[in-house]
């Protein structure tokens, strides 16, 4: 797991909608610790699945990012949520 790579992947692919752990499209579904817990997204498996397959307005990144990049970005999101972004 490479958190620095995860940060780079996040900045390039996720930050347009999720800058600072927020959510521009659905403001109640942020990447903050409490929201991740409430939505049962506070684990690598759930985040990896959603990044890979997309959901609602969120596009699937499975065809655009490698499995390694997706795993790294999931670890970055969990790490940042625990730090409070």
From Swiss-Prot:
Residues the record lists as binding heme c: 14, 17-18, 58
Keywords: Chloroplast, Electron transport, Heme, Iron, Metal-binding, Photosynthesis, Plastid, Thylakoid, Transport
Localization per record: Plastid, Chloroplast thylakoid lumen
GO biological process: one example: photosynthesis
Main location per the UniProt record: plastid
PTM (free text): Binds 1 heme c group covalently per subunit.
Entry GO MF terms: electron transfer activity; heme binding; iron ion binding
SUBUNIT field: Monomer.
HAMAP family per the UniProt record, alphabetical: Cytc_PetJ
Function: Functions as an electron carrier between membrane-bound cytochrome b6-f and photosystem I in oxygenic photosynthesis.
Protein name per the record: Cytochrome c6
Species of the source: Petalonia fascia
């Amino acid at each position: 797991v490479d958190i620095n790579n995860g940060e780079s992947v996040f900045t390039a692919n996720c930050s347009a909608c999720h800058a600072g752990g927020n959510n521009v499209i659905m403001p109640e579904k942020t990447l903050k610790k409490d929201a991740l817990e409430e939505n049962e997204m506070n684990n690598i498996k759930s985040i990896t699945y959603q990044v890979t397959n997309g959901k609602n307005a969120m596009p699937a990144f499975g065809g655009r990012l490698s499995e390694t990049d997706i795993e790294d970005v999931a670890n970055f999101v969990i790490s940042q949520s625990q730090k409070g972004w």
